[in-house]
Amino acid sequence: MSAIYNFCAGPAMLPQAVMQKAQQELVDWNGLGVSVMEISHRSKEFIALTDQAEVTLRKLMSIPANYHVLFMHGGGRAQFSNVVNNFLGDNGQALYLVSGQWSSAAVTEAKKLVSEHNIDSINIVEQINGLYQVKLPDLTAIDKDYRYVHYCSNETVDGIEIFEELDSPWPIVADLSSTIMSHEIDVSKYGLIYAGAQKNIGPSGLSIVIVRDDMLKLPSLPQSSVMDYRVAVEHGSMFNTPPTFAWYLASEVFAWLAAKGGVSAMAEVNQQKAALLYDCIDSNPFYKNGVAPHNRSRMNVTFQLVNDALDSEFLAQAEQAGLVALKGHRIVGGMRASIYNAMPLAGVQALVDFMNNFAVKHS
């Protein structure tokens, strides 16, 4: 069977080696004669798995000792409300930086849970000479006592990524759902990091939350115990039955990434993949991209055909060539190639070859 390269934005492709290992041990995990899906989450075997998963993740991201690592239910949208409920009790206020669809959705969710007067937002994307780019505000010049400032590192729909580090007088809460472990970051600069699993970690239904000790002292709102960060810390992310198979696959992805040389090695490959694809777009008048080069996403490469009447044919022929899930988000249209950690360089090269050939045939 010819190779299939899956460019889906999420749930996204998993490393082939991880999928093959999961297939091999699906019905007999760890010599137990049963699947990892069938054992108690409180068994010594599963506890050993979860302990190792956290150890590996801490090493991969150099997570300081004063941070807790939580494996929680739900995706990024669940954390939109969890952050508010956990940190904005006693009339607390927060600032949201809006760079695209997902950060905007976080604002909308926050305003459902507290008064609109408690949530401030700043649009940080502007269009200059037809290209969208991020302009970070001077947060130190804002005279407000926010509990946190929230931003999304990468807008998967819009193809916009923020590479600059925020200089904030308040704790930073970051949605890293699509960039976690794609390049190195200094975790100590954040109050809380969250990431839905279905892009760079594993299957959907699981979120990783990395939270600093002092954040847990902030006043909270009444909420479900299942989504309370303090309860999750106290119970080792097992207040109730967690999504065990997703946790297992996440642990295997962490091990795979460590074996590949860690986050720094993965960052080099990700840079190569993105450069290869953007070079193809920029060098060919058949395609266009509307994001300024310094804010182009390395994870979600959005592009359009100059002649959009050819979109359907492009997608159909790409699928025939084993290049699937390239259709852009329904809000923005066009094409989107999601090239997370699991996408090999060979997959991006295959896409570039197809794009060049398609352009020649239809020019």
From Swiss-Prot:
Cofactor-binding details, from the entry: Binds 1 pyridoxal phosphate per subunit.
SUPFAM superfamilies: PLP-dependent transferases (SSF53383)
PROSITE patterns tied to this protein: AA_TRANSFER_CLASS_5
Localization per record: Cytoplasm
Keywords from the named record: Amino-acid biosynthesis, Aminotransferase, Cytoplasm, Pyridoxal phosphate, Pyridoxine biosynthesis, Serine biosynthesis, Transferase
Residues modified as N6-(pyridoxal phosphate)lysine: K199
Reaction(s) catalysed (UniProt annotation): O-phospho-L-serine + 2-oxoglutarate = 3-phosphooxypyruvate + L-glutamate; 4-(phosphooxy)-L-threonine + 2-oxoglutarate = (R)-3-hydroxy-2-oxo-4-phosphooxybutanoate + L-glutamate
InterPro entries: Aminotrans_V_dom, Aminotrans_V_PyrdxlP_BS, Pser_aminoTfrase, PyrdxlP-dep_Trfase, PyrdxlP-dep_Trfase_major, PyrdxlP-dep_Trfase_small
One cellular component term from this protein's GO annotations in UniProt: cytoplasm
EC number: 2.6.1.52
Pathway(s) the chain acts in: Amino-acid biosynthesis; L-serine biosynthesis; L-serine from 3-phospho-D-glycerate: step 2/3; Cofactor biosynthesis; pyridoxine 5'-phosphate biosynthesis; pyridoxine 5'-phosphate from D-erythrose 4-phosphate: step 3/5
One Pfam match: Aminotran_5
A GO MF label: pyridoxal phosphate binding
Membrane-spanning ranges: none
Annotated binding of pyridoxal 5'-phosphate, by residue: G76, R77, W102, T156, D175, Q198, N240, T241
A single GO BP: L-serine biosynthetic process
Residues noted as binding L-glutamate in the record, renumbered to the chain: R42
CC cofactor: pyridoxal 5'-phosphate
Purpose: Catalyzes the reversible conversion of 3-phosphohydroxypyruvate to phosphoserine and of 3-hydroxy-2-oxo-4-phosphonooxybutanoate to phosphohydroxythreonine.
Assembly and interaction partners: Homodimer.
Family membership noted in the UniProt record: Belongs to the class-V pyridoxal-phosphate-dependent aminotransferase family. SerC subfamily.
Name by which UniProt lists this protein: Phosphoserine aminotransferase
The organism's taxonomic lineage, starting at the top: Bacteria, Pseudomonadati, Pseudomonadota, Gammaproteobacteria, Alteromonadales
